[in-house]
Amino acid sequence: MAVEARKVAVLVNGNARGVSDRVLRLVSQVVSPEHLYVSHSMSEGRALVRKILSSGYDTVLTGGGDGTFSQFITQIKDTVAAANGAGKMPAVGALKLGTGNALAGLLGCSEPTEEGLTSDYWKARYTALTREMRFVEVEGRLAPFAGVGLDARILNDYGFLKDRSRGTALEPYLSGGMGYATAIGALTIPKVSGARLPIVTILNDGAPAWRVGPDGRRVGPLVLKGETLYKGPVMIASVSRLDGFGFHFRLFPFAYVREDRLHLRVASCGVFEILTRIRGIWRGEYFSDTITDFLVDRIIMQSEKPLPMQIGGDGEGYRSFIRYALARDPLQLVDFRTAYADLPVGPAAAARNRGVEPGLLPD
């Protein structure tokens, strides 16, 4: 629905990998101090969420990546629920500030420049529409995706590389797709090479689920509640409402097939298969007997040994038993792609007013 003059708060994770002092200064130039909230701990984040909700904001933009978004929207949801009907869930969105920005791609977030942040903040206040989306619910938290196995290792290894390269000459080369590729080749693959894959059992714990083929159509019979979806070796077993992790890494090509289902991907690929098919895997175009895809709304996952886990791209230790579900209530997401392209704010707008072509702006 269209909205006029939203009251927008910006809630930033000051500890996120992509949120440096420079980024914080940039955000503070765009957002006035009374609407900017910076958290440095879980407890401080909860306190700021309570303050934001009590101040009557109807929209909250988070800054700090997918993990930050998951953390803050969970705190917002819990605070609203604790109010026993006295509070209302605001519309939520993201500013592209963190290292993991899959959600930013879905919502059309601009790059974290003065122009981009000014544009997105203005759009959130005046012209952007919202879209409904139900997220993954796991361990009481909301997230766009979560899982165990290889994806958790890749995300953790990518974060490690980003941290180690920050402030060095390698930093520009270890960001984005190149950073992911380096993490996979230099860190993740050596860790899993030669290791026996654990046996994982996945049970349907909700509405009828089904397997899908490469075309996204159902394959085989419906799997009812209590029945086994999968039992076998696992390199990765993850669910998602987004089609990937950002940087066009489309690990979940069927995430948008049904709004009332999660895409569950289970893979038992060996290292050689991953390395020789990485381009197709990255694009979401590779399918084989070692990759099994399902559409589900609630599952139970049990592993014979603990596996590395990620929730929203943040490492969460190891788990051998997990329940995943499609959240009951949808979020109202601020979709910047629906807003006007040219806005009367920001450096480019100022240049237009002076009669200067945007491409001739000084650096």
Regions found by a protein language model. Name each.
Residues 1-63, 68-79, 84-86, 117-119, ...:
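ATP/NTP phosphate-donor binding region
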Residues 10, 224-231, 247-363:
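ATP/nucleoside-binding phosphotransfer catalytic cores, i.e., glycine-rich phosphate-binding loops
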Residues 147, 151, 238-253, 315:
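Glycine-rich phosphate/pyrophosphate-binding beta-alpha loops
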Residues 29-35, 54-56, 139-140, 305, ...:
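Short glycine/proline-enriched coil/turn segments at helix->beta-strand junctions
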Residues 9-11, 19-21, 39, 78, ...:
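Catalytic core of DAGKc-family lipid kinases
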Residues 65-68, 74, 97-100, 148-151, ...:
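Short glycine-rich anion-binding loops that position phosphate/pyrophosphate groups of nucleotides
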